[in-house]
Regions:
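Short catalytic/signature loops enriched in Gly
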Residues: 39-42, 135-167
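A short, proline-enriched helix->beta-strand linker immediately N-terminal to the Walker B motif
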Residues: 67-71
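Helical segment within the ABC ATPase nucleotide-binding domain
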Residues: 88-101
Length: 167
């Protein structure tokens, strides 16, 4: 919410989900921001979203997702609009948090590179239907469905001649 400080958003979430006091929520908010790699987290609680870079805003969203101490997080396009170096940092953060917290993550994305980087398994949906699923290596190396094949062929590689994509 662009009209609320980061601290207000985190505290509100913590108070509602964990039923803790405002003071405890503030301390937990600082811990959450620190855990997602936001430097100097305490003064950042009083900042508004527009005062953060895209990568930092994404870290705050991850902190918000972790506020209720979930077993599973669903991340919808978590790296969209981030440059490739920040994207890598966010993916590394997600992987690290999964290990530290024994956390499951479902990532919704169209980015084959993100899937290859972070996923163990992949499910491909087309027109609202599950059309293919399996281990990432299996699906990416030997896709069975035409939609999966077209997604993979849309990823540029340095060893191909340029060609027009079909729609």
């Amino acid at each position: 919410n662009p009209l609320m400080t980061i601290g207000k958003q985190l505290s509100e979430t913590l108070i509602e989900t964990l039923k803790i006091s405002g003071a405890s929520a503030r301390e937990k908010s600082i811990e959450l921001l620190d855990s997602v790699g936001i430097p100097n987290p305490e003064p950042r609680l009083d900042a508004y979203p527009h005062q953060f870079s895209g990568g930092m805003r994404q870290r705050v969203v991850i902190a918000l997702a972790l506020a209720g101490d979930p077993d599973l997080v669903i991340a919808d396009e978590p790296t969209t609009a981030l440059d490739v170096s920040i994207q890598k940092q966010i993916l590394d953060l997600i992987k690290s948090l999964c290990k530290q917290r024994n956390l499951g993550v479902i990532i919704v994305t169209h980015d084959i590179g993100v899937i290859a980087e972070i996923a163990d398994r992949v499910a491909v949906m087309y027109n609202g239907q599950l059309v293919e699923q399996g281990k990432v290596e299996q699906v990416l190396q030997k896709p069975k469905h035409d939609y999966t094949k077209s997604l993979i062929s849309a990823v540029p590689s340095g060893d191909q001649k340029l060609h027009r994509f079909t729609v």
